[in-house]
Design a protein with these regions (language model features):
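Single-stranded RNA-binding regions, centering on S1/OB-family and related RNA-binding modules
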Residues: 1-241
Length: 241
């Protein structure tokens, strides 16, 4: 029995794939005409299957319809996209630490996948990692920085996640041991729990960095914590000689 549903573009509807065509699939959604699921609108998860299961009920997104031409176009890719962004918005709102899969590495940072959406961790938001190339296809802890569904922009921070993990040990005024990881004209970068921290030249007791060497362990005092950006600033000016 067929039902004359009053369907609209943007609706989510249950249907059953009943026939494989050259460029897609025919789907029974209870309307007098069969709906069509083009191959390019099939979600990534289903594409990974060698054969799409027929006669299995599942949900579809109404992508387009033209009743004069008797066509209803469906999408599972769009449905997955909408639901993925709903979960990402929730993760962003709750500001929780999450695990993302690393899918690519470039000079600017890491490409990751979170809830089937591609995201990016800029190099400036990565903790100190010596062998970045070994990270491909592993997971990395991070927090959302920018989550914009309209522009499909997902920017994440590994530093912010690691900083939150060790926040109970890192307070303004705390003196900790750190490792020198880079020397710059404006100061030095040190690693604290693998979180890069800036030791500005004005915060060094003799206003110069040439008495430091890479790998040296030095005591520093935390003077600023930016939890959202995952940044630390440290000083040696107030340490007892």
């Amino acid at each position: 029995k067929k039902y004359n549903y009053n369907i609209q573009v943007g609706d989510v509807i249950t249907g059953i794939i009943f026939s494989k065509e050259k460029q897609g699939y025919l789907v029974d959604i209870g309307t007098p005409i069969a709906a069509y699921l083009p191959k390019e609108e099939i979600s990534i998860f289903i594409q990974k299957q060698t054969d799409i299961e027929v006669n299995l009920a599942q949900e579809f997104f109404i992508l387009a319809q033209d009743l004069q031409k008797n066509t209803i176009i469906l999408s599972t890719k769009r449905l997955l996209y909408i639901r993925s962004w709903t979960r990402i918005r929730q993760l962003n709102t709750e500001d929780i630490v999450i695990q993302a899969k690393i899918t690519g590495i470039n000079k600017g940072g890491l490409l990751v996948e979170l809830e089937n959406i591609q995201g990016f961790i800029p190099k400036s938001h990565l903790c100190y990692i010596t062998k970045v190339d070994t990270l491909l296809n592993t997971t990395i802890m991070c927090k959302c920085l920018i989550a914009n569904e309209q522009s499909n922009q997902l920017i994440l921070s590994n530093r912010a996640a690691v900083l939150e993990k060790y926040l109970h040990k890192l307070k303004v005024g705390t003196i900790v041991d750190s490792t020198v990881i880079a020397l710059k004209s404006y100061g030095a970068f040190v690693s604290i729990y693998n979180i890069p921290a800036l030791l500005h030249i004005s915060e060094i007791e003799v206003n110069k960095t040439n008495n430091f060497i890479i790998g040296q362990i030095i005591a520093v005092q935390i003077i600023h914590i930016d939890i959202k950006q995952g940044r630390l600033s440290v000083s040696r000016r107030y340490l007892k000689k």
